[in-house]
Amino acid sequence: MDWMPLVLAAEEAESRGFSLNLNLLETNIINIAIVFGLLIFLARGYFGRVLGERKSEIENGIREVENRGRQAEQELATARQNLSQAQVQAQQILASARTNAERVRAQVLDQAQIDIARVRETVDQDLRNEQQRILTQVRLKVVGDALARLRERLPGELDEATQRRLLDRSIQLLD
């Protein structure tokens, strides 16, 4: 390449000062336009395809996110419904447990009252039996003591009729 014309042109420009070169061929505007035109013409298909693929990926991503959002909303609604059902069921279980507890409490109290009455009756019966036994022992002791004193005091003085009267009276006292 010959640099000489460029050097001469630069020297001439320096001698004239600063100026605007309006020669289109010298300024390479046409060359740049041709390069850009070819670049656009050749790269348009490639960039169109790349941008189309990118647009398609973005649209698919948006659809997928929207689907996930709808699915999450459905799962949330299902979870809320399940929670509501669980709360209702828990309330029913608590109410049932309270009812059962009250019923069992009433049964236990009733059974306790029955048991207390039965124990009292048994204690009263045992007390009456013990009183009767003690009373019988006391009567026997009194009769035995009375007979012993009579035997000491009246040896040979009692006839058979008097002994019979004493025995009958002693038997009446026992009843």
Curated annotation (Swiss-Prot):
Statement: the UniProt record of this protein carries the keyword Transmembrane helix: yes
Intrachain disulfide bonds: none
Keyword Disulfide bond belongs to the record: no
GO terms for MF: proton-transporting ATP synthase activity, rotational mechanism
Main location per the UniProt record: membrane
Membrane topology (UniProt): Single-pass membrane protein
CDD domains with a match to the protein in the record: ATP-synt_Fo_b
Residue spans crossing the bilayer: 22-42
Keyword tags: ATP synthesis, Cell inner membrane, Cell membrane, CF(0), Hydrogen ion transport, Ion transport, Membrane, Transmembrane, Transmembrane helix, Transport
Compartments it resides in: Cell inner membrane
Domain of life: Bacteria
Subunit structure: F-type ATPases have 2 components, F(1) - the catalytic core - and F(0) - the membrane proton channel. F(1) has five subunits: alpha(3), beta(3), gamma(1), delta(1), epsilon(1). F(0) has four main subunits: a(1), b(1), b'(1) and c(10-14). The alpha and beta chains form an alternating ring which encloses part of the gamma chain. F(1) is attached to F(0) by a central stalk formed by the gamma and epsilon chains, while a peripheral stalk is formed by the delta, b and b' chains.
Listed name of the protein: ATP synthase subunit b
Species in which this protein is naturally found: Gloeobacter violaceus (strain ATCC 29082 / PCC 7421)
